[in-house]
Amino acid sequence: MDPQKALSRTLLLLLFLHLSLLGCRSHPLGGPGSASELPGLQELLDRLRDRVSELQAEQLRVEPLQQGQGLEETWDSPAAAPAGFLGPHHSLLQALRGPKMMRDSGCFGRRLDRIGSLSGLGCNVLRRY
């Protein structure tokens, strides 16, 4: 028999015997340490339940939406958003959404943007170097 095969088989046999001896012992899920942790976990669970009930009571105290105004009316009303909420960025957002952007860029199409950024072909590219 080859010495390398004999060594590997011997190691496998020793590993198997070691694991089989460990398997003969019982390993309960709950040990003596888990019994001492139980009151602490129970107290934590009680505090969590109290906190959840407080939050639910607080949500019920929050003033509900007015009965005459629906969700769509609230969303569309100008009073729903503060006056300075959109601010100066609103016009920029509208410009980006509009179809004029493609006409102002001078590009043949969106797919040429990568070519245009490298060589300037197909777009009126302003170099800022």
Curated annotation (Swiss-Prot):
<feature type="signal peptide">
    <location>
        <begin position="1"/>
        <end position="26"/>
    </location>
</feature>
<dbReference type="GO" id="GO:0051427">
    <property type="term" value="F:hormone receptor binding"/>
</dbReference>
<dbReference type="GO" id="GO:0007218">
    <property type="term" value="P:neuropeptide signaling pathway"/>
</dbReference>
<dbReference type="GO" id="GO:0005737">
    <property type="term" value="C:cytoplasm"/>
</dbReference>
<keyword id="KW-0838">Vasoactive</keyword>
<feature type="site" description="Cleavage; by CORIN">
    <location>
        <begin position="100"/>
        <end position="101"/>
    </location>
</feature>
<keyword id="KW-0732">Signal</keyword>
<dbReference type="InterPro" id="IPR050787">
    <property type="entry name" value="Natriuretic_peptide"/>
</dbReference>
<keyword id="KW-0964">Secreted</keyword>
<dbReference type="GO" id="GO:0097746">
    <property type="term" value="P:blood vessel diameter maintenance"/>
</dbReference>
<dbReference type="GO" id="GO:0019934">
    <property type="term" value="P:cGMP-mediated signaling"/>
</dbReference>
<keyword id="KW-0372">Hormone</keyword>
<dbReference type="InterPro" id="IPR030480">
    <property type="entry name" value="Natr_peptide_CS"/>
</dbReference>
<feature type="site" description="Cleavage; by FAP">
    <location>
        <begin position="99"/>
        <end position="100"/>
    </location>
</feature>
<dbReference type="GO" id="GO:0006182">
    <property type="term" value="P:cGMP biosynthetic process"/>
</dbReference>
<protein>
    <recommendedName>
        <fullName>Natriuretic peptides B</fullName>
    </recommendedName>
</protein>
<dbReference type="Pfam" id="PF00212">
    <property type="entry name" value="ANP"/>
</dbReference>
<dbReference type="GO" id="GO:0005179">
    <property type="term" value="F:hormone activity"/>
</dbReference>
<comment type="function">
    <text>Cardiac hormone that plays a key role in mediating cardio-renal homeostasis. May also function as a paracrine antifibrotic factor in the heart. Acts by specifically binding and stimulating NPR1 to produce cGMP, which in turn activates effector proteins that drive various biological responses. Involved in regulating the extracellular fluid volume and maintaining the fluid-electrolyte balance through natriuresis, diuresis, vasorelaxation, and inhibition of renin and aldosterone secretion. Binds the clearance receptor NPR3.</text>
</comment>
<feature type="disulfide bond">
    <location>
        <begin position="107"/>
        <end position="123"/>
    </location>
</feature>
<dbReference type="InterPro" id="IPR002408">
    <property type="entry name" value="Natriuretic_peptide_brain"/>
</dbReference>
<keyword id="KW-1015">Disulfide bond</keyword>
<dbReference type="GO" id="GO:0005615">
    <property type="term" value="C:extracellular space"/>
</dbReference>
<comment type="similarity">
    <text>Belongs to the natriuretic peptide family.</text>
</comment>
<dbReference type="GO" id="GO:0003085">
    <property type="term" value="P:negative regulation of systemic arterial blood pressure"/>
</dbReference>
<dbReference type="InterPro" id="IPR000663">
    <property type="entry name" value="Natr_peptide"/>
</dbReference>
<dbReference type="GO" id="GO:0007168">
    <property type="term" value="P:receptor guanylyl cyclase signaling pathway"/>
</dbReference>
